[in-house]
């Protein structure tokens, strides 16, 4: 335990908060071929591997994930939300931050309905999270 005088001289340092999505906080200057510190809400990338994996202990499923090489050169593992997808190797996708609790090492989500990732088909509720268009309603026309 420090003395009062030691605290007056030195002071306490605030603990630095670690980022939950560090790959979104790096940019890449392609002219100078150097990484830059630019934060982005989303980043574009190309799928290198699309596969399924099993979750941690109490849960059981086949979760769909993709390994994505981002425009800043970093390769990350991203979760593909929703039922069914059309992604394969070389698909261009947009990723956002957000981990999957039962998949270790998966810190990013692929945004459905943008670039090569199609929206979830026949989705009626929570459509905006899965890139599903509003269905043409025949009841409203009558």
UniProtKB/Swiss-Prot annotation:
Signal peptide: none
Pfam families xref list: Ribosom_S12_S23
SUPFAM superfamilies the UniProt entry points to: Nucleic acid-binding proteins (SSF50249)
One GO location term (cellular component): small ribosomal subunit
Region described as Disordered: 1-22
Coiled coil residues, start to end: none
GO term, biological process aspect, one: translation
Keyword Ribonucleoprotein assigned: yes
Family annotation (PROSITE patterns): RIBOSOMAL_S12
Any one GO molecular function term: rRNA binding
Entry keyword set: Methylation, Ribonucleoprotein, Ribosomal protein, RNA-binding, rRNA-binding, tRNA-binding
Biased composition (Basic residues): 9-19
Record PTM 3-methylthioaspartic acid, positions in chain: 102
UniProt cross-references to InterPro entries, sorted A to Z: NA-bd_OB-fold, Ribosomal_uS12, Ribosomal_uS12_bac
Assigned protein family: Belongs to the universal ribosomal protein uS12 family.
Reported function: With S4 and S5 plays an important role in translational accuracy.
Subunit structure: Part of the 30S ribosomal subunit. Contacts proteins S8 and S17. May interact with IF1 in the 30S initiation complex.
Protein's name in the database: Small ribosomal subunit protein uS12
């Amino acid at each position: 335990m420090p003395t009062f005088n030691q605290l007056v001289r030195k002071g306490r340092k605030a603990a630095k908060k670690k980022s939950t999505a560090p790959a979104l906080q790096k940019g890449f200057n392609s002219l100078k071929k150097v990484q830059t510190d630019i934060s982005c809400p989303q980043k574009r990338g190309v799928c290198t591997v699309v596969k399924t994996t099993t979750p941690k202990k109490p849960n059981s499923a086949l979760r769909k994930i993709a390994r994505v090489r981002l425009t800043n050169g970093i390769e990350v593992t991203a979760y593909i939300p929703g039922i069914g997808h059309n992604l394969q190797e070389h698909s261009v996708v947009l990723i956002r931050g957000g981990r999957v609790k039962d998949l270790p090492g998966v810190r990013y989500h692929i945004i459905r309905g943008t670039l090569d990732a199609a929206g979830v088909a026949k989705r009626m509720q929570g459509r905006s999270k899965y890139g599903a268009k509003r269905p043409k309603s025949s009841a409203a026309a009558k």
